[in-house]
């Protein structure tokens, strides 16, 4: 284990279908999943309820992977960092986005992103009433 990592979390690269679902949510003023950008060492730079990074999908070839990652929302923490978390005040960004992991970034802690493979399955979270139908379609 990397001793310099304070926390780890899985991420999924968005395929076009998932990207379109995210886009539809935002265009309809629904807040849904979280996306993340990270550095060359896979350490998170920022998490957002918006699609990040910005890019024009029309400029990405149909055979190219999208540069956008969905944060799965599961964490592995070091014990001491959880104790520290309780002492830190909410940052303005955490309050604005409603994302607790931003507190770690604000405190300059390393959040390692681990890319996982959905093996062709659709991954979607239950954030809005409209999500139920999509999730039921996947399950049944």
What are these regions (language model features)?
Residues 1-88:
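Conserved core of the sugar-phosphate nucleotidyltransferase
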Residues 47, 60-140:
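Conserved alpha/beta core of the MobA/IspD/sugar-nucleotide pyrophosphorylase nucleotidyltransferase superfamily
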């Amino acid at each position: 284990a990397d001793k310099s990592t304070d926390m780890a979390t899985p991420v999924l690269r968005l395929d076009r279908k998932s990207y379109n679902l995210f886009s539809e949510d935002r265009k309809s003023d629904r807040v849904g999943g979280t996306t993340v950008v990270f550095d060359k060492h896979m350490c998170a730079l920022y998490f957002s309820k918006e699609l990040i990074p910005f890019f024009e999908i029309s400029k990405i070839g149909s055979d190219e992977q999208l540069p956008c990652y969905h944060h799965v929302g599961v964490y592995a923490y070091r014990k001491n960092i959880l104790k520290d978390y309780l002492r830190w005040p909410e940052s303005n960004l955490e309050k604005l986005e409603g994302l607790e992991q931003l507190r770690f970034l604000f405190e300059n802690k390393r959040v390692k992103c681990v890319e996982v493979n959905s093996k062709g399955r659709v991954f979607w979270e239950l954030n809005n009433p409209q999500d139920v139908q999509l999730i039921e379609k996947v399950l049944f």
